[in-house]
Amino acid sequence: NTAKVPNASPTAASAGSDLNGMAAQAAAREIKRRMTAFAAEAHGVAPEAVRFRNGEVSVGDATMSFADLAKKCRQGRVQLSHAGFYKTPEIHWDRAARRGKPFLYYAYGAACAEVAIDSLTGENKVLRVDIRHDAGRSLNPALDIGQIEGGFIQGMGWLTTEELVFDARGRLATHAPSTYKIPVSSDAPKDFRVTLHDEPNRANAIHRSKAVGEPPLMLAISVYSALVDALHSIAPGRQVSLDAPATPERVLRAAEALKSA
């Protein structure tokens, strides 16, 4: 409700965790500072003697739950809300010179895809995919692996099935699920192996993590490349012409061209 709290940035550009995570961390640290100051004053100790660990707070020789301290802070009229703010540092770009640092860091990945094609129909199937993705120090490995799988499947659709077709009057003909084919669960490879390259991000991102939203989409280029390699087996040494998206029709045309060459 933006009438009550600041409006957040959109979840886009693979920057959701980077921006919102760092802003939330900044807010949490300020609230912790207030709670620490309150506890230290109440118990007559230095702020350095206040420790937060595993849901408990140690204040000198005393120990209490985090919930109890929060309750005491509220009763003591300590503000327990804060609006954190974060903007990506160290980025700049000179449009005229085309130089600068447009991104704080880069995410890397590698993928291998195995496909099978039917040279008589153009139908094809992705049999196996192996992915190694650089997620930095992953915030949630299970979620990150799911994001990588989803991004890769989306990329498969981009490169193999999702085709924009316009009629003679320039109107989009593939405008609905009945005409615009997106990947479904049965299109996912039966053997799908994803591992995370667990190495802390050198940039100061939230807990040294890295983006995993959109980067995996590009790894689906491995599927397109595997289709081209499969077509090469029809006529080794000959040039393969295959436009994307590599629909069954286009794979069939490429196969027929190789057979007749």
Annotated model-derived regions:
Residues 1-261:
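Cofactor-binding beta-sheet edge motifs in enzyme active sites
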